[in-house]
Structure formats: structure tokens, C-alpha cells
């Protein structure tokens, strides 16, 4: 079916038959799904038969929306707000979301990987808004970790075929984790999103050895080797993530003084502006 739409789109005489949803319509459709499908409130007055019918209706709504993604009517990235519910609503819609993840990966592995990391970022930011400090033992945080694990497993064992997609996922995750670099609450502390490295750590076993080296270099450029020598608990996500990237390598985690770390923050901000990687 995807090939059929591609043929239509590539034939000028048939382009009028191809419909692409604009941004406004994409937002309306997504809003409908979030409001009427992914809802936790239950009507206690409903009998069992009504509940089953209601679930069936929701599944049809979700399946129809996912078909629009799979058939390229709306961009793959629109699936991030669906992917993020994979763990929380696994019993109700897990099969539909899993199938959609698989199909989007077949269409474009890299776009699928970007959609995955965006869904993880969305959940992480939501957790940040709800909690001044994220509890790594909380159910919400563990659900994000579990979602990352399931995403990683969905790539299978062929690291060569998935190498570009996985590398892009890591780079996007690193960008988020170190941006902003400045910690308002603690000038010598880590970037406020540094804990996100614990999430993308779940994907490190999908990297080829040579790609681990490239991701490590990218990480060091972004963080500017700015890890203070004291390495408190707040820096542990960076330590753990970096250690998984240097397994089998001779490199050791970089150490710098807190003064050097503060001095380099300004340089890093300028690098973010100039670097398109």
C-alpha cells in the first residue's frame, strides 16, 4: 500500500489523487486521539458490555490514526504522541502501537528512531514538570526506562542495518540531555536534563563498536569534558552512559576542575549555535 501511494505521488498526472494532511489537521487528529483514546478515567456506571464496546471504539480510532502514519498520509514523527503510551496502555492498545512501531521502522528506520526519542523526551519533560526532582524509583520514571528498553528491543539483532538510526537517536538524546548546559539551581552542577542519559543508555548495546566511539566523541564535544572531579551523584548518569560507550576502550572518563567547568560553559553555548551536528 505504501508503494501505491509513492507511485501516485511520483506521477504528475495522478498527484491530484494524493492527499497530505496539513499541520493543522495533524494537530486536530492527534488532539482527538489523546482526548478520546488515551484516557484513564473510567465510568463506574458502565456495565461490562458497555466497557468492552467503548474499548473497541477506542481501538478503532487509534488503528485508523496509525494507518494514516503507516501509509504516509501524515509524517512518521506524528507517531511520537502514540508511541509514548506503549507501556502505560499496553494491555488496551499494545498490539496496535507495536505494529505501528514496526511498520514505521520499515518505512524509514531513522525517522522511526527520531520519533522514539521524541516520545521519550516528551514523557521525561512531563515528569520534570510534575516533580521538582525526578525520583528514579518512581513508577513514572521506571515506565520511561521500560519504554526505552522495548524500543531498543524492537530493532532486533542486526546492528549494521540499524546503525544510522541508532546513532541519530543517541545524538538527539545527547542534545536534549545537555541543553540547557547551565544549571540555574547549581552553577557547578550538571545540566538539568542530564538524567535523560540514563534513558538512552538502554540503546547503547545496539551501537557498533566504531559507532560507540563516534557517539562518545559527540558527547565529549557537547559536554566539553566538563565533568568536575568530585563527580557527585547528580553526575552519575553521565558517568554511567560514558562508561557504556568506552567498554573495551582504553579511554577513561575526563576530569576537570569545577573552575574549568564553569569557564567552558560559555564556549559550549557558542558551539551549540555553530554546530549543526
Predicted region positions:
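Long internal repeat-built scaffold domains in very large eukaryotic proteins
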Residues: 1-277
Amino acid at each position: 500500500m505504501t508503494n501505491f501511494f509513492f507511485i501516485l505521488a511520483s506521477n504528475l498526472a495522478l498527484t491530484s489523487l494524493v492527499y497530505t494532511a496539513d499541520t493543522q489537521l495533524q494537530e486536530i487528529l492527534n488532539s482527538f486521539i489523546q482526548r478520546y483514546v488515551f484516557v484513564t478515567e473510567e465510568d463506574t456506571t458502565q456495565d461490562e458490555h458497555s466497557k468492552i464496546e467503548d474499548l473497541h471504539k477506542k481501538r478503532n480510532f487509534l488503528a485508523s490514526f496509525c494507518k494514516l502514519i503507516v501509509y504516509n498520509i501524515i509524517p512518521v514523527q506524528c507517531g511520537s504522541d502514540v508511541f509514548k503510551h506503549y507501556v502505560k496502555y499496553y494491555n488496551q492498545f499494545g498490539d496496535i502501537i507495536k505494529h505501528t512501531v514496526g511498520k514505521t521502522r520499515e518505512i524509514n528506520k531513522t525517522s522511526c528512531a527520531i520519533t522514539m526519542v521524541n516520545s521519550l523526551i516528551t514523557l521525561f519533560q512531563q515528569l520534570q514538570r510534575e516533580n521538582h526532582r525526578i525520583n528514579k524509583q518512581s513508577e513514572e520514571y521506571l515506565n520511561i526506562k521500560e519504554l526505552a528498553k522495548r524500543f531498543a528491543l524492537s530493532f532486533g539483532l542486526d546492528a549494521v542495518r540499524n546503525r544510522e538510526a541508532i546513532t541519530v537517536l543517541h545524538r538527539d538524546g545527547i542534545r536534549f540531555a545537555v541543553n540547557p548546559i547551565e544549571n540555574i539551581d547549581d552553577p557547578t552542577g550538571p545540566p538539568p536534563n542530564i538524567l535523560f542519559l540514563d534513558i538512552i543508555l538502554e540503546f547503547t548495546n545496539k551501537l557498533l563498536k566504531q559507532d560507540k566511539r563516534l557517539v562518545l566523541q559527540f558527547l565529549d564535544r557537547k559536554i566539553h569534558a566538563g565533568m568536575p572531579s568530585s563527580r557527585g551523584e547528580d553526575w552519575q548518569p553521565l558517568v554511567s552512559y560514558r562508561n557504556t560507550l568506552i567498554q573495551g576502550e582504553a579511554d577513561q572518563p575526563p576530569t576537570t576542575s569545577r573552575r574549568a567547568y564553569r569557564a567552558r560553559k560559555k564556549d559550549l553555548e557558542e558551539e551549540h549555535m555553530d554546530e549543526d551536528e
